[in-house]
Regions:
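TRNA-recognition modules of translation machinery and tRNA-sensing kinases, especially anticodon-binding
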Residues: 2-256
Length: 256
């Protein structure tokens, strides 16, 4: 699944990166996460100003902290392959059991820097492109899904607009249910202001804050649920999606 996602992102013009598992708390705060507190989703390292990352968004966004980019460099599209660590504070109930919510998983994350403008033209176009790529990934896997345009009241602090992809998971709930597998957000200049990331247009005075966007390509645990539950057969075997057969080396996984 990682190689499948990474291959598509490389073809889409993303620079592939392997990101660290630790980040400075000032970067977490700049991205919009709270590294301390009773309801935090972050694992902090005692007696340090470091925390385990919950997503590569944190380290990818922090790559250009306190820098001024040239407009000609934009957009910058990065893909991070990382471990993700989350406390999952407050998670409970049957729907969260198994590997749907876990404390550590691997994820391929998209992150983009675009020019900032009052109409959000560049970042809005990029958001639609990130959504297109997420749909392309799950179309390629043959997984049924739906797109949710997140209501304003459900947006977190950093996000100006956010889409979720929910995949059909036959084993979820009593008779199957939709489960979130990706999300993509346009944070406009929220993160850039806090991290001090600007850009300069040639021939113009002054600088402007960039806009930042993030999006899940594939979160391994949840994508695996969707693949296994949609492709499992009556005899217990699992048909391997055609897009993955080159890496799996077979077209069906049989029970032992």
């Amino acid at each position: 699944l990682q190689r499948y996602a990474a291959g598509i992102l490389a073809d889409e013009g993303f620079t592939l990166t392997t990101t660290p598992d630790l980040a400075r708390n000032e970067i977490l705060s700049g991205i919009g996460y709270q590294p301390r507190g009773p309801e935090t989703q972050i694992y902090s390292i005692e007696n340090t100003e470091l925390s385990l990352v919950g997503t590569a968004e944190i380290t990818l966004g922090g790559m250009y902290a306190e820098q001024t980019l040239d407009a000609e460099q934009l957009p910058i599209k990065l893909a991070g392959i990382s471990h993700c660590f989350r406390t999952e504070a407050g998670a409970a109930g049957k729907a969260t059991r198994g590997i749907y919510r876990v404390h550590q998983f691997t994820k391929v994350e998209m992150f983009a820097f675009t020019e900032g403008d009052a109409e959000n033209k560049a970042s809005s176009a990029m958001l639609e492109d990130l959504l297109r790529i997420e749909c392309k990934l799950f179309d390629g896997l043959g997984i049924p899904y739906r797109v949710i345009d997140t209501p304003i009241g459900d947006l977190g602090g950093p996000a100006y607009r956010k889409y979720d992809l929910e995949a059909w998971m036959p084993g979820r709930g009593d008779g199957g249910a939709w489960g979130e597998v990706t999300s993509t957000s346009n944070c406009t200049d929220y993160q850039a202001r806090r991290l001090g990331i600007r850009f300069k247009r040639k021939g113009e005075k002054g600088t402007t804050f960039v806009h930042t966007l993030n999006g899940t390509a594939v979160a391994m645990s949840r994508a695996l649920i969707a693949v296994l539950e949609n492709y499992q057969q009556a005899d217990g075997s699992v048909v391997v999606p055609e897009a993955l057969r080159g890496w799996v080396g077979k077209d069906r996984i049989s029970p032992r």
